[in-house]
Design a protein with these regions (language model features):
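Active-site-proximal beta-strand/loop segments in catalytic clefts of secreted hydrolases
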Residues: 34-36, 59-61, 95, 117-119
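Local sequence-structure signature of Cys/Sec-based thiol-disulfide redox active-site neighborhoods
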Residues: 24-52
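Bacterial N-terminal signal peptides
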Residues: 2-16
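Ser/Thr- (and often Asn-) enriched beta-sheet segments in non-cytosolic proteins
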Residues: 32, 55-57, 155
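Thiol/selenol-based redox catalytic cores and closely related redox-interacting motifs
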Residues: 70-171
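Boundary at the C-terminal end of the N-terminal hydrophobic targeting segment
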Residues: 16-25
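Loop/turn elements at helix/coil->beta-strand transitions in domains of secreted/extracellular proteins
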Residues: 28-30, 54-55, 80, 110-112
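N-terminal, post-signal-peptide region of Sec/Tat-exported proteins
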Residues: 41-89
Length: 171
């Protein structure tokens, strides 16, 4: 009986170890967000990333320093938003959904990064109206004319190594 138990253990043990290995979560690279202070929508986007498993650090920058950061990370000027982030070897510009970032890290395309240009309402961090934030954020958002929340369709753009863009995800 003891021999039978040992034989079964030897057969099952490698499989149980493999199952345990597969169940272990993969560590995500940390996200560093560079944002002007105060930007409540940027803070909400950071919370969205945290809720999806990312470790996030926010570095408050002067508005005047943001263009230098965007140039350093090779963000095309036509795709700029308020905040800029770095995850692994990629930049994230604007309110990029966490599921797009996760897919980027899984697929590992040869690219500079992802961008959601402007400030589309309904994007992560832009789900609700905040009059305090809109004072700064509406520069790119129709001057804050609409107080009611409206969800806007938006695309996440993949920026290739040469700066060319393609639609990575539609929301």
């Amino acid at each position: 009986m003891r021999a039978l138990f040992s034989a079964i253990t030897l057969l099952v043990l490698p499989w149980s170890h493999a199952a345990t290995q597969a169940a272990e979560p993969v560590a995500l690279p940390a996200v560093v967000i560079y944002a002007p202070s105060p930007c409540l929508a940027c803070i909400d986007w950071a919370d969205h990333l945290r809720q999806n498993g990312f470790t996030v650090t926010m570095e408050e920058k002067l508005q005047a320093d943001m263009p230098k950061i965007k140039r350093w990370l090779n963000v095309p000027s036509a795709l700029e938003s308020v905040h800029t982030a770095k995850v692994g070897r990629y930049f994230l510009e604007g309110h990029v959904p966490a599921q797009d970032v996760l897919l980027l890290l899984q697929e590992k395309p040869i690219a500079r990064g992802l961008a959601v240009p402007g400030l589309p309402r309904g994007a992560p961090g832009r789900e609700s109206y905040n009059p305090i934030c809109d004072t700064a954020c509406t520069i790119l958002d129709n001057g804050g004319q609409a107080k009611d929340i409206r969800r806007e369709a938006f695309n996440t753009m993949l920026v290739g190594p040469d700066g060319r863009t393609s639609v990575y995800a539609r929301h």
